[in-house]
């Protein structure tokens, strides 16, 4: 890491949550990007709470857990492949997760990501719930 990037990193570490939120907004405007798309839940939660006013965040959940409830025995390998791709687990760990259903596949992910993963697992032959 260069001295310049280290200095910037140290400056960022000293920011309060409010200052960090303002910085993110300024970066989004300056570069025409959205932090919510790349950072997922971490950046989406403060934005949702600020945009809805008081009580808005409590009405709609922003983080979801994807839970594999069961799977069709004939589709075990397909479900296993989807779980491995989604979690980055090794073959043995993914197999243990799938075989111990009901089991949480991913925790605290954005609604869109959770729904996408649910659809992929269901298409492979698994039964999934979002909590």
Curated annotation (Swiss-Prot):
Superkingdom of the source species: Bacteria
Any one of the GO BP annotations: translation
Keyword Ribonucleoprotein applies: yes
Signal peptide boundaries: none
A GO cellular component entry from the record: cytosolic large ribosomal subunit
Disulfide bond residue pairs: none
Entry's Gene Ontology molecular function annotations: mRNA binding; structural constituent of ribosome
Keywords of the record: Ribonucleoprotein, Ribosomal protein
InterPro entries assigned: Ribosomal_bL12, Ribosomal_bL12_C, Ribosomal_bL12_C/ClpS-like, Ribosomal_bL12_oligo, Ribosomal_bL12_oligo_N_sf
Subunit details: Homodimer. Part of the ribosomal stalk of the 50S ribosomal subunit. Forms a multimeric L10(L12)X complex, where L10 forms an elongated spine to which 2 to 4 L12 dimers bind in a sequential fashion. Binds GTP-bound translation factors.
PANTHER family cross-referenced by the UniProt entry: 39S RIBOSOMAL PROTEIN L12 (PTHR45987), LARGE RIBOSOMAL SUBUNIT PROTEIN BL12M (PTHR45987:SF4)
Described purpose of this protein according to its UniProt entry: Forms part of the ribosomal stalk which helps the ribosome interact with GTP-bound translation factors. Is thus essential for accurate translation.
HAMAP family hit by this protein: Ribosomal_bL12
UniProt record similarity statement: Belongs to the bacterial ribosomal protein bL12 family.
Protein name: Large ribosomal subunit protein bL12
Gene: rplL
């Amino acid at each position: 890491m260069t001295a310049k990037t280290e200095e910037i990193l140290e400056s960022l570490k000293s920011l309060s949550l409010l200052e960090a939120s303002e910085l993110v907004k300024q970066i989004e405007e300056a570069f025409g990007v959205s932090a919510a798309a790349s950072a997922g839940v971490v950046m989406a939660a403060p934005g949702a709470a600020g945009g809805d006013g008081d009580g808005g965040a409590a009405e709609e959940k922003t983080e979801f857990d994807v839970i594999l409830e069961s799977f069709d025995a004939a589709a075990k390998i397909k479900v296993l492949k989807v779980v491995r791709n989604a979690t980055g687990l090794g073959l043995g760990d993914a197999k243990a997760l799938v075989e111990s259903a009901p089991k949480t596949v991913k925790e605290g992910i954005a609604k869109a990501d959770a729904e996408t993963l649910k659809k992929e697992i269901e298409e492979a032959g698994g039964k999934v719930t979002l909590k």
